[in-house]
């Protein structure tokens, strides 16, 4: 009897969770991630875009949603669309302090695949300036050298 009650409560909780209004960053991020895992990429993009439009989120949170959209589109090899989200993310986070992430080299790669080498170099230089608060950004130095010496298509 108790297990039946617990099962019903769990079902009600899952139903509520799937229908609750999205109001916080975590709600948008988690819901979009779940949809992305189910390969419902269009729905995941829509959910994140709803969060981006919500001005109760901080610029850094909205930038993170753009970054997640960019990563998803990069996986789908939609490089130009991916870089549009990265552009928006960097614009929103321009004056914010955010930690180094190992995925930044993939971001730069997306710019190269989209034929935007100059923008890749500008972004890399901007990231390198962030060493003042996070020394891990120094790990992008070899990438900068590679960009400077690189000729042709990626």
Language-model segment annotations:
Residues 22-57:
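Alpha-helical segment of the N-proximal tetratricopeptide repeat
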Residues 22-23, 60, 98-100:
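Residue signature of alpha-solenoid helical repeat architecture, marking inter-repeat boundaries
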Residues 55, 93, 130-135:
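Alpha-helical junction/boundary sensor with strong preference for TPR arrays
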């Amino acid at each position: 009897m108790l297990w039946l009650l617990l099962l019903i409560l769990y079902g009600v909780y899952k139903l509520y969770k799937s229908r609750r209004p999205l109001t916080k960053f975590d709600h948008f991020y988690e819901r979009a991630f779940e949809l992305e895992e189910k390969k419902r990429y269009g729905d995941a993009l829509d959910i994140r875009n709803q969060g981006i439009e919500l001005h109760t989120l901080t610029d850094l949170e909205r930038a993170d949603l753009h970054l997640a959209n960019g990563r998803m589109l990069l996986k789908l090899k939609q490089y130009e669309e991916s870089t549009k989200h990265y552009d928006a993310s960097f614009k929103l986070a321009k004056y914010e302090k955010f930690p180094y992430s190992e995925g930044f080299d993939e971001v730069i790669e997306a710019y190269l695949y989209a034929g935007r080498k100059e923008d890749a170099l500008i972004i890399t230089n901007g990231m390198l300036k962030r060493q003042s608060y996070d020394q891990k950004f120094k790990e992008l130095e070899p990438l900068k050298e590679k960009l400077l010496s690189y000729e042709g298509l990626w």
